[in-house]
Every structure is written in structure tokens, then in C-alpha cells.
């Protein structure tokens, strides 16, 4: 939809299995296949920060007429993909020890499994902070913003459950309760008519993935019949310019 609306769209993948059709017909960089030699790639995978490498150059190669409309970059993380949580973090970013260092989780003490998972969460924090720093560095050029939503949670041994994927009706909250993080630069707030006080007041509001599609369309002012303002979490915090 964003591509059809004229935006320059770029999909960056750092997870095996690809985008499963979601990124068809848009420019895509598959870091799993590239595995560019360096400290951010080892053995058969790369750490998520690799998606920030060469990003300016990748964006510059997108069509100029689309870049003039706006740039949207999707980053598909490896994140906390299990069961080998320990592989998701560089050695220097492991604040929780000891951690489970095998994908056979039943061989580890539960706290070791939790530590390995928590290390992956801490590294995602670092990745998001680095992405926001990159965006802040481009505020004179663009009006940047960031939305982060996890696709699922994870069971770490509670009630003998591991990983995720139980039917929604039976899945515990650990598999269903995920974070949604929004960061808007001042230029983006002004351009979009967003009231920061209104947004902060919504911080504790329960959301679902159903809100994501409509919220992105609203933020980017995409006019389409499929847009539902009732599912746009920013709609009542936005004043038309």
C-alpha cells in the first residue's frame, strides 16, 4: 500500500525464512544471504545492528521521485528468535549470566534460559537506541519516526511451556503480551499534527497487531478505503495541518 502511495519503501531482512510474501514487489536486502564479513556477522548469521550498516547508501539508491515523497524502511529482526537465544547477542552485550548456550533448552536450568532470552531483549534495546540515534542524525534532512512492534512473546519454561505458537485461545500471556514502542522526532510531530501530551497519556493503553496497519497509514497520511480511523491509535492525537 505504501509503495502504491508513492513512498520509497525498503525492506531489510535479518531472519531466515524471509518476509513470507509481505515484501513482494518492494526493494529488499537480505542480510542472511549477504552475511557481510565483519564483527556483526559470525558463522551463519548476523546481529541485528548489521541492518544499520550502509543504510544511507541503500536509501540513496531508491528512486529519487519516491524519496521526495518520503522513505519507509522496514527492519525484520532476528530479535529474540529461539530456541538458540544465546546466538542473538554479541559476547560484549550479555549482562545476564550464566546463560543457556544450546538450543536444547531442557538441558539448561530455567534461569539460564531466562538469562539468554533477557540478553536478547537487552540487545534489542541497544538496536532500537542505535536506530533512533541514526534517525536523529537525519532530522535536518527528514522528519523521522520509528515504530517497533514484536510479533509474539515467548514461554521460557513456565508450566513446562517453551517458545510460542499455541492457539491464541490457549496461549499464556507470555506468548501474547508484546511491546509497542513509538518514537517521533519534533519535526515529525509538527508535520503530522501530533500532540505529544496526548500520545504520552496513551502509554498504558492495550493495543493489538490489528492497530498497526491503520496506525501506519494514518501517520503517513495515506488515503485509502481500507483505512479504519477507529483502529488508528494516533488518530485522536492528531490535528490536521
Model-identified regions with their sequence ranges:
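Catalytic domains that recognize anionic headgroups
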Residues: 1-241
Amino acid at each position: 500500500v505504501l509503495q502504491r502511495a508513492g513512498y520509497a519503501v525498503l525492506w531489510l531482512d535479518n531472519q531466515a525464512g524471509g518476509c513470507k510474501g509481505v515484501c513482494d514487489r518492494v526493494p529488499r536486502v537480505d542480510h542472511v544471504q549477504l552475511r557481510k564479513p565483519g564483527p556483526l556477522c559470525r558463522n551463519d548469521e548476523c546481529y541485528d545492528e548489521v541492518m544499520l550498516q550502509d543504510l544511507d547508501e541503500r536509501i540513496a539508491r531508491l528512486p529519487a521521485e519516491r524519496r521526495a515523497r518520503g522513505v519507509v524502511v522496514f527492519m525484520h529482526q532476528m530479535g529474540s528468535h529461539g530456541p538458540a537465544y544465546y546466538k542473538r547477542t554479541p559476547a560484549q552485550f550479555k549482562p545476564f549470566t550464566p546463560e543457556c548456550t544450546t538450543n536444547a533448552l531442557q538441558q539448561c536450568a530455567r534461569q539460564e534460559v531466562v538469562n539468554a532470552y533477557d540478553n536478547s531483549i537487552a540487545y534489542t534495546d541497544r538496536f532500537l537506541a542505535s536506530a533512533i540515534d541514526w534517525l536523529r542524525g537525519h532530522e535536518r534532512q527528514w522528519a523521522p519516526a520509528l515504530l517497533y512492534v514484536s510479533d509474539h512473546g515467548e514461554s521460557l519454561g513456565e508450566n513446562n511451556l517453551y517458545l510460542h505458537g499455541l492457539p491464541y485461545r490457549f496461549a499464556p500471556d507470555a506468548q501474547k503480551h508484546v511491546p509497542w514502542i513509538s518514537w517521533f522526532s519534533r519535526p515529525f510531530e509538527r508535520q503530522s499534527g501530533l500532540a505529544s501530551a496526548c500520545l504520552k497519556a496513551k502509554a498504558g493503553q492495550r493495543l493489538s497487531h490489528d492497530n498497526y496497519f491503520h496506525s501506519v497509514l494514518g501517520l503517513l497520511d495515506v488515503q485509502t478505503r481500507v483505512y479504519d480511523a477507529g483502529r488508528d491509535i494516533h488518530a485522536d492525537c492528531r490535528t490536521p495541518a
